[in-house]
A protein has these predicted regions:
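Heptad-repeat amphipathic alpha-helical coiled-coil interaction surface used
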Residues: 6-7, 13-14, 40, 63, ...
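Amphipathic, coiled-coil-like alpha-helical segments
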Residues: 78-98
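Amphipathic, heptad-repeat alpha-helical segments
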Residues: 29, 36-37
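Solenoid-repeat scaffolds in large eukaryotic assemblies
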Residues: 25, 32, 78-81
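Long, amphipathic, charge-rich alpha-helical segments that form helical bundles/coiled-coils
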Residues: 52-66
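Amphipathic, charged alpha-helical scaffolds that flank and support histidine-based chemistry
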Residues: 48, 66-82
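Short, solvent-exposed, charged loop/turn and helix-capping segments
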Residues: 38-53
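N-terminal first-folded block
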Residues: 1-24
Length: 98
């Protein structure tokens, strides 16, 4: 699932930051951002306008956190993005199980 891969990318970015591997960090964050952009692009505003608007705001926040982590070389924004996307992934899994 995309949410799991997002978490893997953020974990790799954290490891890369600790190792001062700027290229590895950038590659991992770039891939995580691509996942969020694809999720955002898949929103069907005609089918569920309010839900999609809320998810779009969450995705924009996550993208901003990833950008901060990438630019400032810090882990806390990665942790915020990871936590939020994990919660969304859990919600999607629960909804799918119904």
């Amino acid at each position: 699932m995309l949410f799991d891969r997002f978490a893997q990318d953020c974990a790799h970015a954290r490891t890369s930051l600790a190792a001062k591997d700027i290229h590895g960090k950038a590659k991992a964050i770039d891939h995580a951002m691509c996942i969020v952009i694809e999720l955002k692009a898949a929103l069907d505003h005609a089918a569920a306008p309010e839900l999609c608007a809320n998810l779009e705001a969450v995705y924009d926040f996550v993208l901003a956190r990833l950008s901060d982590a990438n630019a400032k070389l810090t882990v806390p924004p990665l942790d915020q993005a990871t936590k939020l996307m994990a919660e969304l992934g859990d919600a999607f899994r629960q909804g799918h199980a119904l």
